[in-house]
């Protein structure tokens, strides 16, 4: 698997619609400084591979097109009922829906990554430690209600990963 560098400082991993996997320059710099291990980067790559293998990027593009159509129709309707605010309300509803769909995709990609990490012999610990580090780096704890976030809260993701591990190992 070829890992590409996306030249931006924020710490992130990305999957492109064509299947390429990226980590940001900021992420790579954390690795170079010894703040992140190669096993933790492997967990991010496995997660992004999950997005590709499960068709999340393509699905998100389709969802986005549909969401724009619904947002426009809902905005037009609500603008007639609530002049001046209808478009704004429709936009909020659309964003909430997209955040929910994105969180579902994140859980699925986490599960895919966990299975890959376990199968490779690395186990789930690098995945869990990476989430904890990302949580500290991004300082997102408690900044937004979970229903507004595009990614599930770290504690929920870690608990989900532990459940997957228990399911695979029967414990």
Where are the language model's segments positioned?
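A Zn2+-metalloprotease active-site environment signal
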Residues: 1-171
């Amino acid at each position: 698997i070829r890992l590409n560098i996306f030249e931006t400082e924020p710490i992130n991993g990305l999957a492109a619609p064509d299947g390429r996997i990226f980590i940001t320059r900021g992420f790579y710099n954390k690795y170079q400084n010894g703040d992140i291990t190669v096993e933790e980067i492997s967990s991010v790559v496995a997660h992004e591979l999950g997005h590709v293998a499960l068709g999340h990027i393509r699905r998100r593009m389709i969802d986005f097109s549909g969401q724009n159509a619904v947002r426009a129709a809902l905005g037009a309707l609500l603008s007639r009922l609530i002049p001046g605010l209808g478009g704004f309300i429709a936009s909020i509803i659309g964003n909430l829906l997209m955040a929910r769909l994105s969180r579902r995709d994140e859980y699925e990609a986490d599960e895919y990554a966990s299975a890959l990490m376990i199968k490779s012999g690395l186990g789930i610990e690098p995945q869990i430690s990476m989430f904890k580090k990302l949580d500290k780096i991004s300082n997102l704890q408690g900044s937004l209600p979970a229903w507004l976030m595009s990614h599930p809260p770290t504690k929920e993701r870690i608990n989900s990963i532990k459940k997957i591990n228990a399911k695979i190992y029967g414990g």
